[in-house]
Curated annotation (Swiss-Prot):
Protein name: Formimidoylglutamase
Record-stated family: Belongs to the arginase family.
Residue positions binding Mn(2+) 1: H130, D165, D169, D269
Function of the molecule: Catalyzes the conversion of N-formimidoyl-L-glutamate to L-glutamate and formamide.
Cross-referenced Gene3D superfamilies: Ureohydrolase domain
InterPro entries referenced in this protein's UniProt entry, alphabetically: HutG (IPR005923), Ureohydrolase (IPR006035), Ureohydrolase_dom_sf (IPR023696), Ureohydrolase_Mn_BS (IPR020855)
SUPFAM superfamilies: Arginase/deacetylase
Reaction(s) catalysed by this chain's protein: N-formimidoyl-L-glutamate + H2O = formamide + L-glutamate
Listed cofactors: Mn(2+)
UniProt organism field: Aliivibrio fischeri (strain ATCC 700601 / ES114)
Co-factor: note: Binds 2 manganese ions per subunit.
Taxonomic lineage: Bacteria, Pseudomonadati, Pseudomonadota, Gammaproteobacteria, Vibrionales
Gene (name only): hutG
GO BP: any one term: putrescine biosynthetic process from arginine, via agmatine
UniProt entry keywords in alphabetical sequence: Histidine metabolism, Hydrolase, Manganese, Metal-binding
Length: 350
């Protein structure tokens, strides 16, 4: 029987959570599809999965469409993975951008994230293009602003954004959704602008902007973007630097970055990986960063605690998976492994 619920452009469709059942192993043989639950207003202190079914930002950025379908494909890849987790996992459904109104979809995602965080969940968002990042940050900001109202006066929050990505995504907004000439004075975001939008928001709010971008393809980022990153104080490493020889230096820099922040937001653009293991993206990487390097850096992010012993990581999202161009579901399985690893690390000592 299909289990499906609709609310405010958000759907919960549990039909993707199907897979193998090992009755002979009892509780020790459970898999994700047997453990993930539908969210409701009474759920607290777990992990909330939210989908962002959207590739409008990729289309505006002249990329290859197809990321809209990613959240459900990721769920299907997750469904059959073995359950080794300590926390309940809830499915909060998808925010769907069906009409080109990216800004509304990002706002709705932010509202759902704020609600999940207020209910003491940590959140994993399944994108969608990397325009998801602006919606994710809106949710974090809404949550922290609501906390500040209750506990004011309070200093500005120090939010550390850690982005594994081949691109800075610091581009300026365009004057039209299609990036073509327009007489409109309104500016539009896309999949290449989210961290510019976040930096502008932080500037208006008088919040510090702390951004780390690891895995950059220098040939895909202009001098203007490197200059802008320097002006904004961005911590960054190019893909050619992301190797075992440099791993201690990178871990040290990341540790110092984590230490100076009260909260963390982790975002992984799947195009940071080599095309050989992640063909299903809008912009496949020629070189990329190996999975073993990125998995070596994740524990420090997932285990980071504040002075109260609470996890600094509020939210993680995964972006730019494009099932249209995947080969034998290998990118889907890669994304599922990352979600599995993040969810496991959020509620354990890894």
């Amino acid at each position: 029987m299909e289990r499906s619920f609709m609310k405010n452009n958000s759907s919960v469709n549990m039909t993707s959570w199907m897979g193998r059942v090992d009755h002979e192993d009892g509780e020790l043989g459970l898999r994700w599809h047997q453990k993930v639950k539908v969210t409701n207003s009474t759920n607290q202190d777990g992990i909330m999965l939210l989908g962002f079914a959207c590739d409008e930002g990729v289309i505006r950025n002249k990329g290859r469409k197809g990321a809209y379908a990613a959240p459900q494909v990721i769920r299907r890849a997750l469904a059959n993975l073995a359950w080794h987790h300590q926390s309940d996992v809830y499915d909060g459904g998808d925010i769907q951008c069906n009409d080109g109104d990216l800004e509304l979809a990002q706002k709705q995602l932010g509202i759902k994230i704020k609600s999940a965080l207020a209910n003491r969940h940590q959140v994993i968002v399944l994108g969608g293009g990397h325009e998801v990042a602006w919606g994710s940050f809106q949710g974090i900001a809404r949550y922290l602003q609501s906390r500040a109202v209750l506990t004011s006066p309070t200093p500005p929050p120090r939010i550390g954004i850690i982005n594994f990505d081949a691109h800075f995504d610091l581009r300026n907004l365009s004057q039209s959704p299609s990036s073509s000439a327009s007489q409109s004075s309104k500016q539009y975001g896309n999949s290449g602008t989210p961290f510019h939008q976040i930096s502008e928001f932080c500037h208006v709010q008088h919040w510090p902007f702390h951004y780390a971008c690891l895995g950059l393809n220098k040939g895909s980022n202009t001098q203007a973007l490197y200059h802008k990153a320097k002006q904004l104080g961005v911590l960054h490493f190019d893909d050619i630097e992301m190797n075992l020889l440099n791993l201690p230096q990178i871990k040290q820099a990341l540790s110092e970055f984590i230490e100076q922040n009260d909260f963390l937001y982790l975002t992984i653009d799947i195009d940071v990986f080599p095309a050989s293991c992640a063909p299903g993206v809008s912009a496949p990487a020629v070189r990329g960063v190996s999975l073993d390097i990125i998995e070596s850096l994740l524990p420090d992010i997932l285990k980071a605690k504040n002075q109260h012993g609470e996890s600094k990581l509020l939210l993680a999202d995964l972006a730019e998976f494009n099932p249209t161009f995947d080969i034998d579901n290998q990118t889907a399985r890669l994304v599922a492994r990352l979600v599995w690893t993040i969810a496991h690390g959020m509620k354990s000592n890894m």
